[in-house]
């Protein structure tokens, strides 16, 4: 059963939490948990066959990203697979959007099979200790979205880069 913190007013603790957790949440930047890298930009003749190719549409889709849910395909070299491949638990961020509200949206790759990600995507590779699915939902909270949108820049088209994502600070249990 969840514990209600509304009356206790403990600092930096969610109003409703599970009894297995105690103490305040700690602030950490995304760079403490993730190493960021921009995606692959292949020429058009390589698109349509080959390996699953994660795009913005896959990030925005409901649920997590799996090998079978990826919509696109691309022919990739072994070197490109090494450089732009995704691993189970990698977080993928939307790098560019026509609306500020969508810039930096995130999803998680939850599969062990080889796939690569595209140039309008930034991969967050795990370097810290976290649960990937928790991280996906944390990044979708109103506070996380507000902090992410603040890092977006642009007039008609909004972008966020690796540096902007690295600086986002969130609370972790």
Task: Give the predicted meaning of each segment.
Residues 60-72, 91-117, 133-137, 146-150:
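Short, ligand-facing micro-motifs at secondary-structure edges
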Residues 4-10:
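BZIP DNA-binding basic region
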Residues 31-43, 58-90:
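Sequence-specific dsDNA recognition surfaces
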Residues 4, 40-41, 79-80, 110, ...:
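Short, solvent-exposed loop/turn positions at domain surfaces
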Residues 13-40, 167, 171:
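Non-catalytic DNA-recognition/assembly elements of restriction-modification systems
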Residues 10-14, 41, 114-121, 130, ...:
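A short glycine-rich beta-alpha junction/loop motif
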């Amino acid at each position: 059963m969840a514990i209600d913190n509304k009356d206790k007013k403990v600092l930096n603790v969610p109003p409703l939490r599970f009894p297995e957790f105690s103490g305040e949440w700690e602030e950490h930047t995304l760079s403490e948990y993730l190493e960021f890298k921009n995606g692959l930009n292949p020429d058009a003749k390589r698109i349509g066959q080959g390996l699953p190719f994660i795009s913005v549409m896959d990030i925005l889709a409901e649920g997590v990203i799996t090998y079978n849910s990826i919509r696109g395909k691309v022919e990739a070299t072994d070197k490109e697979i090494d450089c732009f491949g995704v691993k189970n638990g990698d977080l993928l961020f939307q790098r560019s959007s026509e609306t500020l509200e969508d810039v930096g949206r995130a999803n998680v790759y939850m599969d062990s099979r080889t796939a690569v990600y595209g140039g309008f995507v930034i991969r967050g590779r795990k370097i810290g200790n976290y649960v990937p699915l928790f991280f996906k939902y944390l990044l979708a909270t109103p506070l996380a979205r507000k902090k992410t949108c603040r890092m977006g820049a642009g007039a008609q088209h909004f972008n966020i880069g690796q540096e902007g994502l690295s600086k986002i600070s969130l609370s972790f249990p």
